[in-house]
């Protein structure tokens, strides 16, 4: 009995081909590619960045996640703000974030970056939360966070990137922000009001002294300089005379 040449069903060859084909969408492929190409922009302003620097070493080896530190915002898609952000540095941070290409992500690292930390109550120059300037994707609390915590934050960010939709990313709006305490500074009057310069001790002395002395100030200075010079001249002449007398005594003794 001869076997059927064209049996009903899939051939083994076609079955192997179907097993090797993966059906996906362009968005999923894009997310999968970006998982291993998160290039962080190093933005360390305080002590938290020391922990991030130890993450670059061989002990933790964050290169396995495809992280390549960059120094240019145009080549980075992840910025890790590590440390205190001051009022003067805020415009520079916003400009760096705007120069990064889309899609871009932010990790707020440390208590000082998230809420202002120990400077959140009585500091007039500290930004109380970097999310007031730029949108934050992952909050990493700690003072400072350990390198293991940084790795955990990167893993959570990778999960977010894997489930991301491009349209949702464009319509993203920062709504949930960390609570920060308002400052307790009391307004004080201005210090530089001119009172110090108008103080009598800061006034320039007049050219002449009291009118009862009948002697101008410049003449008194000149007379004091002349008396000092005369005293110096008399002392030098006296020293010369003593030196000559001593020399004559020594010469007479030799004779």
From Swiss-Prot:
| Keywords on record | 4Fe-4S, Chloroplast, Iron, Iron-sulfur, Membrane, Metal-binding, NAD, NADP, Plastid, Plastoquinone, Quinone, Thylakoid, Translocase, Transport
Q: How does it sit in the membrane?
A: Peripheral membrane protein
Per UniProt, the cofactor note for this protein states: Binds 1 [4Fe-4S] cluster.
Q: What is its main location?
A: plastid
Subcellular location(s): the record lists:
Plastid, Chloroplast thylakoid membrane
Assembly with partners or alone: NDH is composed of at least 16 different subunits, 5 of which are encoded in the nucleus.
This chain's protein is named NAD(P)H-quinone oxidoreductase subunit K, chloroplastic
Source organism (scientific name): Zygnema circumcarinatum
Q: What is the lineage of its organism?
A: Eukaryota, Viridiplantae, Streptophyta, Zygnematophyceae, Zygnematophycidae
Q: Which gene encodes it?
A: ndhK
